[in-house]
Amino acid sequence: MEVKIFTLLQIALFIALGIHLVVAGPETKEDKKSDVYELFTVEYCGTNCTLLTNGRWTACTGKKGTCRCYHESGEKVGLCLSTEYTDFSEYPNPKSSEIDAAAPLPRETH
């Protein structure tokens, strides 16, 4: 009986801690050097790459040539992934007048 109660308390503690961490989120300073202004995306290209007997890897096709083979050392099979890095600190913050000007206008009916 004690083991069941102890296990239940551990599970409740892990759930509470997990919820707290999700709600708290990462702490970042929103300045231009912060990670908040950087975005690194990785997409799976839908294929794998394999090590050939001549030591080269099979080509990764797809996504208009942006796919590359990523593999762990010593492995003979890797994943074809497309990566992209965007640094939003290079772009100015839009003003509300710019946002209003870019908003779609309602259709005029005659």
From Swiss-Prot:
Residues 1-24 form the signal peptide. Residues 89-110 are annotated as: Disordered. It is found in: Secreted. The keyword Manganese does not apply. It comes from the Eukaryota. Disulfide bonds join C45-C67, C49-C69, C60-C80. GO terms for molecular function: C-X-C chemokine binding. Its main location: secreted. The keyword Cell membrane does not apply. Glycans are attached at N48. Keywords: Disulfide bond, Glycoprotein, Secreted, Signal. One of its GO terms (cellular component) is extracellular region. Salivary chemokine-binding protein which binds to host chemokines CXCL1, CXCL2 and CXCL8. This is Evasin P1166. It comes from Ixodes ricinus.
